[in-house]
Structure formats: structure tokens, C-alpha cells
Amino acid sequence: MRFERPSLVESMGLSPPRERFRQAMIALRGDEDVPPSRYDASSLKLLDPRLSIPLWRGRYAVHRQVVLTNLFNHRQTPIELGWSVQRTQVEDFRGKASTYDSHNGTDFAVPRGTPLLAPASGVVVRVVSEFHRGGLKLAIDHGDGLITSSAHLARVLVKEGDRVRRGQHVGITGYSGLDSFVTFPWGIPHVHFNVWLDGEPVDPFARVAHPEEQSLFVGGRPTPIPRDVEAEEPRGSDYDPARVDAIVAACITPRVRARLASIEPLLMRGGHTIFEKNYYPTRFPDRASPLREVHARRPRLHLPFSADLFDGAVFQDEL
């Protein structure tokens, strides 16, 4: 396995330009049901040329290491106020401040053109490019209520409905989306990695202050996928059709409500609904779980990268 070399246009997701401009205006001005994004001088702390320059050039920032930059924020500001890249109230799983206000995922900083692998077996439930919300994104339902979403990609190699195995090559990383465009070349190319359990965003790391909490990473820490990994059979989650339809019916945006209601089969409708209500939470007053059962945290995920290219992960604030 080797690094690819996507163009800057593909890496940043700039095409088609007219549509990207329209989407950029949503982030800056807001929409009928989406408040504008919030940023200030504290947002400049997200820039780091010592990491960004080599990664944009397709090289390691730290040899054979994934750099963990922004972590899941356990003190997120109300999303009704708008997506915030400010740092006003932040706490990562270690009790430190490597995150920002609205960050509900984990950022894996890797060289542009890194092969993206499936972190566990599952079914592809969403592929979409939205310049104002994370660029090109790929979501996989791994069964038992667990979905992962990888954002800021340059290219996706699978389609919705595909069944993929742990370690399968599913995409190529870049840094697509508006934040890349406005911060180039000081913004750090990365994969924004969301984990949703029973429809809600969760931190894949176990909180240090909660020793009873289980990590979602295999072995308790983020490790790349070995070439000879044993891959389980792909399957999706067991959705309750009445619960899914109730969440969709409560959506306040008519065009989104109609699109979700038309999706078949149930697995895809459930996956699309979870994806939509997490990327656009102000559209969904009903936050109930769409799953038939409640699922506990357990170690199921690898880093979505190959052990051929990476040995492990390091924290940006410890470099």
C-alpha cells in the first residue's frame, strides 16, 4: 500500500465551483435551519505550519505516526448557537484542551493522499460532498448501533449500499471543505472521524477520569490495521422502523424530511437519518435512538489506516 497524489482541486473538494460557493455561503451566513458558524482569534490555535506543510506535500509530519490533533470535546457549546471553532469551553478525554467548542469527533492528521481503510466491517450508508460541512464524507454502519464517518476526503472508492470488510481500501484522504480553503496552507490536512453509537456522537477514547468506561479501539488504543487482520462479516444495525420514521417526521426541514422518508431499505434510511441529524442537529428536535436495542461501548475499531504506512498515533500537544 502506498500514498496517492490527488490534485489540490480534488484534495480541497473545489469542484464544481458554483456549487461550492453556494455551500460556503451557508457556513458564513447560515440557512433556513442552520445558524452561521462561529470563529474568533482563538480559532487561530488550530493552525500549525510545522505539521501542515509536510502533510500538504504528502509527507509524514512525524515519521510513520498518525498525529491526533483535535479530540472530542466533552463540554460542547449549544449547537443552536451555530457550529463553533472557537475555544471557549473545552475538555478532551484526558482532561486537557486539545479540541474546540463544537468538535464532536477526532482528527487524524495524515499526509494528503493517504489510503483510507474501513476501521471495521460494515455497510456503506452515506457518501456525500458538502463544502460547508466537512467536504467529502463516507459513513459506514458497523452493526450493533455503531457508525463511523470520515470527512475531508479527496476521493471515495465505494458507494452507498456496498458491504466492506475491516481493512478494505475505501477512500483517499485530502482536506476537502471550506476550512481547508480559508486556512491553506497553514490548516492541518486531516480526517475528521466521527463515531456514533445508537445515533449519538461518542468519544472513541475512554475518559481518563472514568476508569469504568471502555475504549472503542481494539486493544484499548488507536492502532493501524495490520495486513493479516481477521475481518468479520459485514452487517448493518437493527433499526426500529417506527422510531426511524418518527425522527424523520419530526424533521423541521421539508425537503430533508421528504428525502429521508423516500429512502429504502430501512438500513439505508436509518443510516441517512443518523448522519443527517448529527451533521444538522438543529433540523431534528427528536433525539431518540432509532435502534431497536441499546448497545454498550466495546472495543471494535482500528485506526482507518494501514500498518504498512503507520506504526501508531501521537498527540499534537505532546510533540
Label every model-predicted segment.
Residues 115-126, 158-173:
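Short, well-structured beta-strand-loop connectors
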Residues 138, 162-235:
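Conserved, short, structured surface segments that act as functional micro-motifs
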Residues 64, 80-89, 150-153, 201-211:
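Short amphipathic beta-strand/extended segments with alternating polar/hydrophobic composition
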Residues 119-157, 178-190:
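Zn2+-dependent peptidoglycan hydrolase active-site motif and core
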